[in-house]
């Protein structure tokens, strides 16, 4: 699921204006919430809110998805978050090779850069795993 979503995002015809992103989001299986740049989608741990930010030209810059978030919050769930992070990193490593950035600390993260001039960053927080997709318009802020 993680790799398939990233591949679909990479293949989109960037730049895309945020105010024109609704139809693209719906093709990805996401639903508009009525708030510009906020969508909902179903992932491994259920329905999550997706946030898209824009640049000065109103093009989508970064798509942020809490890709894995357990329903409950406890010690056991912390382990699930870590396991999910490790599994997603392993899947990415298998398909795209070694990330260009690996940080192991309280909020560990890895990042891959692609020839299409996009960056995918996967971050493990205490309660969830976040997927941040930097479009060619957003890569400048990375």
What are these model-derived regions, one by one?
Residues 1-107, 114-119, 123-142:
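Short helix/turn-capping signatures at newly exposed starts of structured segments
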């Amino acid at each position: 699921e993680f790799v398939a979503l990233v591949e679909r995002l990479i293949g989109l015809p960037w730049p895309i204006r945020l105010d024109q992103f609704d139809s693209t989001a719906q093709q990805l299986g996401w639903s508009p919430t009525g708030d510009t740049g906020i969508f909902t989608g179903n992932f491994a741990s259920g329905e999550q809110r997706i946030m898209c930010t824009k640049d000065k030209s109103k093009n989508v810059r970064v798509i942020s998805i809490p890709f894995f978030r357990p329903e409950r919050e406890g010690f056991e769930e912390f382990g699930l978050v870590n396991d999910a992070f490790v599994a997603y990193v392993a899947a990415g490593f298998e398909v795209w090779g070694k990330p260009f950035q690996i940080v192991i600390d309280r909020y560990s993260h890895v990042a891959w850069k692609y020839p299409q001039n996009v960056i995918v960053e996967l971050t493990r927080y205490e309660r969830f795993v976040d997927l941040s997709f930097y479009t060619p318009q957003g890569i400048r802020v990375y």
